[in-house]
Amino acid sequence: TITGDHRLIQYLLNFSRPFIYTTAMPLHAAVTIQFAIEMLSDTKEREILQSNITYFKEMVEHFKLQDIFINSASPIQSAVFASPARVKEVTMKLKERNFDAKPILSPTVPLGQERIRFCVHSYNTYDEIQEILFLLSTFV
């Protein structure tokens, strides 16, 4: 249901007919989307990304950081700290060493659960992953 004045209703009736009277996605759109999904799931980049995520998690354990990291299988990994000041301090130290980790502060997350977000990419090297986690281990 759409509410509005007479002019709005008339405009929508006259210029939105394909949307108003359509009940399903066109077949060609569904086929295109399916093809895109298949292409994305079969790419070498995706395999490399998954390998990097696995390596990141292994290095978290190697450097004994699992107590601060949220368990996640996604490319977005988060280390939780008890204070926003500590998150800012550690993030700044990482930036000084050319690592782009992002602080996530309250009110985006609950107070006392501030965190540093790490985004793992397919183009990251194992050396980069190891170095950032080594640095993090020296800062915590």
Regions found by a protein language model. Name each.
Residues 1-11:
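Active-site PLP attachment segment
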Residues 9-13, 30-37, 54-57, 133:
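Predominant activation on well-ordered alpha-helical scaffold segments within soluble catalytic domains
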Residues 12-25:
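Active-site PLP-lysine loop of aminotransferase-like
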Residues 24-42, 48, 52, 61:
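Structural motif of enzymes handling amino- and sulfur-group chemistry
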Residues 45-57, 61-98, 108, 113, ...:
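Conserved PLP-binding catalytic core of the aspartate aminotransferase-like
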Residues 90-95, 131-137:
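Short amphipathic alpha-helices in soluble, non-transmembrane regions
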Residues 104-105:
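Cytosolic Rossmann-like ligand/nucleotide-binding regulatory domains
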